[in-house]
Structure formats: structure tokens, C-alpha cells
Amino acid sequence: MSEISTALSLENCPCQSSHHYADCCGKFHLRQAFPETAEQLMRSRYTAYVLKNIPYIVVTTAPSQQTLLKPRLLQEWADNTTWLGLEILKTESLTKTQSAVEFKAIFQGEEGELAHQERSIFVKIENRWYFVDPTVSLPTMKQPCVCGYGKKFKHCCGGFL
């Protein structure tokens, strides 16, 4: 948590929103508020990686996927990566409870400066946004969706991945 304490004094939030960290992603990291949009969650997750706040990454992943994550590997990756910038390319409201955010993140890895571009899917469960992680084992198309709404995966979040 010392990274977060240090970040609270940052004038500009690492998510590049042009807001002070404490008024932007900091309030989410400290659980003083929850992101109201998928884009806010995307920005707060990026900032969590910048600050190596892996517990936040885990709790903002779809609840049914959280136990499938490997926090130690996420921490190792975060420790070996220097984040240089975030650009939100597009946000889409897919349904009332599902949104997509396309972004590009620039980072310095072991191989040099790289860009990661992705279209991420977010789901709103009980009035909170979560990231649907496509890198962990997903249900088959006929199994219940990871979001818990009771639809088959193929007719819910699976249709957007």
C-alpha cells in the first residue's frame, strides 16, 4: 500500500485523465468509491498496474473469475514492467450491464518499449463494474456466463469476447 500512499500526493493521476490521483483512481483504490463507468474501471485498473496494486486487479475482475487469477504471476509481471502511458481509443455501451473499452497502453518491458492494444469487456454486477478476463479459463458456450446473470455464456459476455 506504500505505492498508493505515495501516489496520493501525485498531481496527475497515472491514468492520464488530467485529474489529481486522490480525486481520480485513488478514491477507487482506497475503496472510498466505486467506478461509475467501465472506462473509469479501465483507467483505475491501469493505474493499479502502474502502482503494482495487484489486490485491486483481483477484486475488480468478475467475481467468478477471481479464484482463477494467479496474483503472484501478476505481481511478477507488474514488478518487471514500467508503464509509460494510456490512451482510451473507444468506449461502447453494449447492453445495460455490459460495456467495451478499447485502449492502448505503452510500457517498457524486458524487450524494450512496447504497446498493448486491447478491446476489454466489462460487466456490471449488483451496480458495480468488473473486468471480464479473457486470459483465464472461460466457460464453454453452453455453460452459465461469468457475470452470473443466468444466461448461457454464448448469449451473454461470450458474444463480445
From Swiss-Prot:
Signal peptide: none annotated. Pfam families: YchJ_M-like. SUPFAM superfamilies: NTF2-like, Sec-C motif. NCBIfam families: PRK01752.1. PANTHER family: ADENYLATE CYCLASE-ASSOCIATED CAP C-TERMINAL DOMAIN-CONTAINING PROTEIN, UPF0225 PROTEIN SCO1677. Belongs to the UPF0225 family. This is UPF0225 protein NTHI0386.
